[in-house]
Amino acid sequence: MNSKIKTAVKALVSTMFFIVLMTNAATAQEKDKATEGAKVVTTQMKSQLALNDSQYTKVMDVNKTFLQKAAEAEKGTTNATEKAKKIKMFTDERDSKLKSVLTETQYKTYTANKAAYGKKFREFYQ
């Protein structure tokens, strides 16, 4: 009986270890996807908005943070209304941060192209 318990405990520990390992791998993939998406959108923004190097770095950080939060909301929320509220909140947060980084002219161009950026962002968090 004692050896059966030891075997069961070993199997349980092995299974738990495997689950933790897979969860960490999935989280790393989500972060990589957020980084990739932020690079794609920020590079597009750099050419359309004529961002300087300092702005590019700040916009990249803002976009990456947005994508990480949006992906978490997409994955962690089953209610469509709640999900939409969270994405709207994260979008407003991103816009506010971008407004402080961009010039007035750049921000106007950004808002004119916002739908296209949003479509591109969705490719990376849905």
Q: Which ranges hold each PLM region?
A:
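Bacterial Sec-dependent N-terminal signal peptides
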Residues: M1-K33
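Charge-rich (acidic/polar
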Residues: N2-S3, T27-Q126
